[in-house]
A protein has these predicted regions:
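N-terminal binding-site loop/beta-alpha segment at the start of enzyme catalytic domains
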Residues: 1-76, 134
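Conserved, mostly hydrophobic/aromatic
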Residues: 21, 47, 62, 77, ...
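Active-site mouth loops of central-metabolism enzymes
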Residues: 22-30, 81-90, 114-119
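Short, acidic/polar
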Residues: 27-39, 87-103, 152-156
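A structural motif
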Residues: 44, 105-108, 138, 203
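A short, structured active-site edge motif that brings together acidic residues
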Residues: 73-84, 168-173
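Active-site gating/metal-coordination segments in enzymes
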Residues: 87-114, 120, 170-172, 178-181
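Beta/alpha (TIM)-barrel catalytic core signal, keyed to glycine-rich beta->alpha loops juxtaposed to Asp/Glu
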Residues: 120-221
C-alpha cells in the first residue's frame, strides 16, 4: 500500500487505511477469512467490529483470523460496545473484556460507544473510558450515533477535567440524507453544523452507510 493513502489518528502510532472493513454479516469462518485476506491484500488494515454483531461471532471470526495470521500489531481494530438497552457506564468494562477474550487480544486500538443514553451524564461515560485507557485496554475512543450537542458536551467536560476526549465519531455520513433512522437510535453527522464542528476540532469521522445502502446505484447495477 502507498504511504500517501494512509491516515493518522491522534493517539495511535499505527497508520490507517482509508477504507474500513465492517466485520458484521460474515456467514462463517471460511468466508470471513477469505474476505479479511482479500482486504489486507489490497492494503487494508482497519477492522470494525462490535459486541453485538452476529451474536459475538464477528469478534470471534476476527480473533481467529488475527491469531492464524499473527498480525495483531499490523492491523487496527475498532470495537464498539454499550449498545441499547445496555448503554450504561457499568456495561462498558464487562462487554469490552468479553470482546477482548473473543478477539484473543489484550487491547483495542479504537473503542466506540455504540449508542448514547440521554439519562446518563456525559461525565460518567468519559470517566469510565479514561479509566480503561489508563489501564491500556483501549488506545483511543469515540462515540457512535451521538448527537452534536452531547458529543460537544462530552468533550468540553473531558477538556475541563484534563482527560482524554472523544477523538472520533462514527455516525452516518453520506451525500444522501437519512430521512428515517436505519436502525433505532441512529444519528447522522452530515448536517452543516456537525461538519463544521468536526472540521474545526479535527475530529475524525468513521462513517457508516456512506453509500446509503446502494441508493446511488443505477437500477441495472
Amino acid at each position: 500500500r502507498g504511504s500517501s493513502q494512509m491516515k493518522k489518528l491522534p493517539g495511535l502510532s499505527k497508520t490507517l487505511f482509508p477504507i474500513v472493513f465492517g466485520c458484521d454479516n460474515q456467514s462463517d469462518a471460511n468466508h470471513a477469512f477469505a474476505m479479511f485476506d482479500h482486504y489486507t491484500s489490497l492494503g487494508g488494515n482497519v477492522f470494525d467490529t462490535a459486541y453485538i454483531y452476529n451474536d459475538g461471532m464477528s469478534d470471534q471470526y476476527l480473533g481467529r483470523w488475527i491469531n492464524a495470521r499473527n498480525n495483531r500489531e499490523e492491523i487496527v481494530v475498532l470495537g464498539k460496545g454499550a449498545h441499547s438497552p445496555d448503554c450504561f457506564p457499568s456495561a462498558i468494562r464487562p462487554q469490552l473484556e468479553e470482546t477482548l477474550n473473543r478477539l484473543q487480544s489484550n487491547y483495542l486500538d479504537i473503542y466506540c460507544l455504540h449508542r448514547d443514553n440521554l439519562d446518563v451524564p456525559v461525565s460518567e461515560f468519559i470517566d469510565s473510558l479514561n479509566d480503561l485507557r489508563e489501564e491500556g485496554l483501549i488506545k483511543v475512543f469515540g462515540a457512535s450515533n451521538w448527537s452534536l450537542d452531547r458529543f460537544k458536551e462530552a468533550n468540553e467536560y473531558a477538556h475541563s477535567t484534563n482527560q482524554q476526549p472523544f477523538t472520533l465519531i462514527s455516525n452516518n455520513f453520506s451525500l444522501a440524507r437519512m430521512i428515517e433512522p436505519v436502525w433505532p437510535g441512529c444519528i447522522s453527522c452530515s448536517e452543516e453544523d456537525f461538519k463544521s464542528y468536526l472540521e474545526a476540532n479535527q475530529i475524525a469521522i468513521f462513517p457508516w452507510s456512506s453509500q446509503a445502502r446502494g441508493f446511488f446505484l443505477d437500477q441495472q447495477e
